[in-house]
A protein has these predicted regions:
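Phosphate/nucleotide-binding beta-alpha loop and adjacent structural elements of enzyme active sites
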Residues: 1-238
Length: 238
């Protein structure tokens, strides 16, 4: 019997993204493995991939045996490419419906308004605007094993103080790329998010970074001078 082909390969469709974008994705997934620090997707995990793009992380989650994966992506073109890249999870798999359960959701999570021409290169946006708790309620996802976030500034609204109790008790692990300059007012938004969300979780010793010095740097008044424009934050509850 033929073995199951791996979904995360160098033959994935890239949806005509620029060479710089593909190089960044390749480096973050294959080289630095940014989303694998401190926790990797385990068999039977429930995975929520916010900012799924062309499906690289979701493909990795599927290859690792995730029980269910939700791909949330505001760009229809990228989401359709992600579905294509994950087609192997369904085609010629008689157990796909029972075992795989990959769901593609055309939505912008954490955003109150969307200008796709600036953010995703698309002139119009016809998907949903969705909060984390709206997603949890609508799709009946009471617990999340791995919450991956790459949302270009919307991470502050996803990991919002109003969601803190859910994040602390119902999400096992969060791997989030934080952007300091992805939107106007980003500095003040980060400071508020740092004080209302990150600090309480840091006090519980649940926050991790790729660089241990960031624990101190994020709390400094001159954090913009000390931190890169984007960096990874991990919240590990158990």
């Amino acid at each position: 019997m033929f073995s199951k082909p791996k979904s995360l390969t160098f033959e994935m469709d890239t949806a005509n993204l620029s060479i710089n974008e593909i190089a960044h994705l390749h480096h973050s997934i294959f080289v630095s493995k940014d989303y694998d620090w401190w926790y990797e997707v385990l068999p039977e995990d429930i995975v929520v991939d916010v900012g799924a793009g062309i499906g690289m992380f979701s493909a990795k989650a599927y290859d690792n045996g995730a029980k269910r994966t939700y791909m949330i992506e505001p760009s229809r073109k990228l989401l359709e490419t992600a579905v294509k890249n994950l087609a192997g999870a369904y085609i010629d798999r008689p157990d796909a419906y029972e075992r795989c359960r990959i769901k593609a959701i055309h939505a912008a999570m954490g955003r109150t308004d969307v200008d796709c021409s600036n953010v995703w290169g698309e002139p119009q946006y016809d998907g949903k605007l969705m909060s984390l708790m709206e997603f949890v309620d609508y799709y009946d996802v009471p617990n999340i094993s791995f919450l991956k976030i790459s949302a270009c500034g919307a991470e502050y609204n996803i990991l919002h103080e109003d969601n803190l109790n859910f994040i602390a008790t119902n999400v096992r692990h969060t791997a989030c790329r934080v952007y300091l300059n992805a939107q106007y007012g980003g500095v003040e938004k980060f400071k508020h998010w740092r004080d209302s969300v990150l600090k309480p979780m840091m006090d519980l010793n649940r926050v991790y970074f790729q660089d241990d010095t960031y624990h101190e740097k994020v709390m400094q008044d001159n954090f913009m001078e000390l931190l890169p424009a984007s960096f990874m934050v991990y919240i590990k509850n158990w």
